[in-house]
Amino acid sequence: MVKYLSQSEAIELDLDLFEMFHVGQLMELAGLSCADAVAECFPAQTHPRVLVVCGPGNNGGDGLVCARHLSLMGYQPTVYYPKPTLMSLYENLTNQCHHMEIPSVKKCPSLSDAEEDYDLILDALFGFGFKPPVREDFVPLVKMMQETKVPIASVDIPSGWDVEKGKQSECDFEPKLLISLTAPKLCAEHFKGEHHYLGGRFVPPALQRKYQLNLPDYGSKLVVRL
């Protein structure tokens, strides 16, 4: 059985990966994996309009990469990136979205706008470094995701969930799709949605042994269903 990681294990594993790979390389593979998982569950023919919600950390970077790949797969992504990270890696990812002519919005969509304008929300707001409560700046966005009927695909962690314990009283939305990256986190044991995929086909054998990950065989795929 695949190992589900604690928050401290996930952080330590990430640090080990950063010693072996450039963070941009890992982000590219993670974001592409997310796009593949979306395509498996929500085809562009039925869910073309995707709101990609990006947070200020690595999870948001994964979202920017995913938006770019979704645009190449026939989707019509729109990026909402309320707190951009002022580092060259993230600025480059943002510029790449601009070059792909991916539109962005400056304000958090209202509940009615989200349900009228989008067929899917990609939640790349908070990652496994998150600790409750949700920052005040992001409360309206999380509230919209809690109340919307638009299906949500969450990247690694449903935003606002405790990384180990799962749903919190102030954030209890259930995504339709959870895309765990590298290895699932403990909160994924509480996931009750329809689709759970694992992406991140880049963990060297030594790290798989060190953390006893027992990862599935990806074969030629970028993601596997759990």
From Swiss-Prot:
GO terms for molecular function: metal ion binding; NAD(P)HX epimerase activity; nucleotide binding. Residues 10-215 form the YjeF N-terminal domain. Binds 1 potassium ion per subunit. GO terms for cellular component: mitochondrion. It catalyses: (6R)-NADHX = (6S)-NADHX; (6R)-NADPHX = (6S)-NADPHX. It comes from the Eukaryota. Pfam families: YjeF_N. Catalyzes the epimerization of the S- and R-forms of NAD(P)HX, a damaged form of NAD(P)H that is a result of enzymatic or heat-dependent hydration. This is a prerequisite for the S-specific NAD(P)H-hydrate dehydratase to allow the repair of both epimers of NAD(P)HX. Belongs to the NnrE/AIBP family. This is NAD(P)H-hydrate epimerase. It comes from Drosophila persimilis (Fruit fly). The lineage of its organism: Eukaryota, Metazoa, Ecdysozoa, Arthropoda, Hexapoda.
